[in-house]
């Protein structure tokens, strides 16, 4: 408990014990005290935190769910809509991506994109980067992920594009916001960001018939060294994988390099979520696993467009899905970090279509 002070108002002494009920409920509350006396004095107020953490205050589908970590869902506002005049993907109305299902049934091979298609995706990648940077610059202590979703939604619409996650298999928001132990596909809600959080924002745009996908993990306030190391490891894993991309590289080789680096840093690599082909379809071939000894098929060819998005965990690589059918969390409740780019294979290597235009992530967030 080094560095933690007593939660009793006006005390300020170093904490020596923690409320056992808060521990059992995995509550993110002021729960440390310097002595039994302070604990008993503050108890009439402190016990109110326990009421807030009880299942009856959670969305109904969570009331019998055993959470793996301290994060809890809060209220989710109604789904927004795109205004008239915005080109819609095939799932925007009915929620089912029919074109993806047709491609799956036909087991379509990796697509070789034309120079004209790549130019559209190049412009789209730049737009997607602009939107993500707007969200990243806005994220701060006290802001809710719902507010970030509004920012993303408006920024996408202002660019004449559609936020690809919106109503994709009924996903209710315009971006994914994944906090702390959430690996991916977190749903923006009304929980305020807190000092020490790590937050991943995942943005995808649909424009002129194509999708572009990227994400980054941000440090909210003062993050501990272990958390910073986790985030930097995820960033480095993406960078080293991108550096390997060129004609002839086997897709399965990326996972070997990513896992080797993550394990060396004391972290693990998620196996159940992968990078993917992208273009006219939100998700298509190739599948791009991030773990070693995977069975990914094929080699990179000029014109292939796909994402790399390693998810790196502080503890176990295993995950489970919340009852909302979307939010993927670590099985042990420890934190996860992720970074993603969309890139195209060229004659001489690759071009990152979602690259930064204002300095590297590390330069901006770790110095």
From Swiss-Prot:
Major site of localization recorded for this protein: cytoplasm
Free-text comment on the cofactor: Binds 2 divalent metal cations per subunit. Has a high-affinity and a low affinity metal-binding site. The true nature of the physiological cofactor is under debate. The enzyme is active with zinc, cobalt, manganese or divalent iron ions. Has high activity with zinc; zinc cofactor is transferred into the active site region by the ZNG1 zinc chaperone.
Binding annotation for a protein: 185, 283
Entry annotated with the keyword Manganese: no
Binding site for Zn(2+) 4: 213, 276, 309, 340
Cofactor: Zn(2+); Co(2+); Mn(2+); Fe(2+)
EC number: 3.4.11.18
Protein name, as recorded: Methionine aminopeptidase 1
Organism per entry: Dictyostelium discoideum (Social amoeba)
């Amino acid at each position: 408990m080094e560095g933690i002070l007593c939660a009793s108002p006006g005390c300020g002494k170093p904490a020596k014990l923690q409320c056992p009920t808060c521990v059992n409920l995995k509550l993110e509350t002021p729960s440390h005290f310097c002595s039994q006396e302070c604990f008993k004095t503050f108890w009439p107020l402190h016990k109110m935190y326990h009421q807030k953490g009880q299942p009856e205050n959670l969305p109904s589908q969570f009331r019998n769910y055993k959470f793996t970590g301290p994060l809890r869902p809060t209220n989710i506002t109604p789904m927004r809509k795109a205004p008239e005049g915005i080109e819609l993907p095939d799932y925007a109305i009915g929620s089912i991506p029919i074109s993806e299902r047709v491609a799956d049934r036909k087991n379509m091979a990796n697509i070789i994109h034309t120079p004209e298609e790549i130019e559209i995706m190049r412009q789209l990648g730049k737009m997607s980067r602009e939107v993500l940077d707007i969200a990243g610059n806005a994220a701060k202590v006290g802001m809710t992920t719902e507010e970030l979703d509004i920012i993303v939604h408006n920024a996408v619409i202002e660019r004449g594009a559609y936020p690809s996650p919106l109503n994709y298999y009924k996903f209710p928001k315009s971006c994914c916001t994944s906090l702390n132990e959430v690996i991916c596909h977190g749903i923006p809600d009304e929980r305020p960001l807190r000092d020490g959080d790590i937050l991943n924002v995942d943005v995808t745009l649909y424009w002129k018939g194509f999708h572009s996908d990227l994400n980054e993990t941000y440090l909210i306030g003062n993050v501990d060294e272990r958390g910073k190391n986790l985030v930097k490891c995820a960033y480095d894993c993406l960078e080293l994988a991108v550096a390997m991309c060129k004609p002839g590289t086997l897709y399965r080789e990326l996972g070997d390099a990513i896992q080797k680096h993550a394990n060396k840093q004391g972290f693990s690599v998620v196996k159940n979520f992968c990078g993917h082909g992208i273009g006219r379809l939100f998700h298509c071939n190739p599948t791009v696993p991030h773990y070693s000894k995977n069975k990914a098929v094929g080699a990179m060819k000029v014109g292939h467009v796909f994402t790399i998005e390693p998810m790196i965990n502080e503890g176990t690589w295993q995950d489970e899905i919340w009852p909302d059918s979307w939010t993927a969390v670590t099985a042990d409740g420890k934190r996860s970090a992720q970074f993603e780019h969309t890139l195209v294979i060229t004659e001489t290597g690759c071009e990152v279509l979602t690259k930064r235009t204002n300095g590297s992530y590390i330069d901006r967030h770790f110095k």
